Amino acid sequence: QTFTWMIEGEVVHRDSLGNEQVIRPGQVNLMTAGRGIAHTEDSVVDGARLHAAQLWIALPEHERRREPAFQNHPDLPVVDVGGFHATVLAGSALGHVSPATVYTPLVGIDLTAAGAARAELPLQADFEYAALVLRGTATVGGAALAPGEWLYFAPGGEQLAVRCDAAAQLLLLGGLPLGEDILIWWNFVARTQAEMQAALDDWNAGRLAPVRAGSPAAALQAPTLQGTRLRG
């Protein structure tokens, strides 16, 4: 699954199912690739500033060949906690449930503060977590983080202290460890080297469904493995 959280600017999504959707700030686009989907993402206004967080969510083995799908979520649950404006992007948190469809136990929260803020967030003990600062600076679990910096937390925690001294925005992501090895190359996810090679061959030969909604972008060629041995 490709999960896009739009922060600034507008992007139009088009895909091989025929969807065409503009995503705006405060909205989520969720594309489930399943057995296969092609898509493009283009700026609505050329040269405009864009800022988004795009995350990939691995489907478990028993779900990964499901039918492809696309969702746009313009309305997400929001709660104020300790001066943070908390948006529940995925899963269940802070007494709210996101409408986004996911296939493993996980959670995603955007924490945005206009000024100084401090919160103690409850954690699920069997989840692993990561924090990512998007704008400003924040202290998470006692560690100071700058924009673009990640901090990982192993399972076992029950609470997490988050604070900022000025305006900031960060993501808190968590979930049960997947427990499966996956391979990633370019825009493809597979379980074996042979499966990855077959997907690359099909794409570069034009055997996969094209984007149907009139995207101006031409299909890109996937880089070949060229003797590379992938490891999960």
Label the predicted regions.
Residues 1-232:
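Jelly-roll (double-stranded beta-helix
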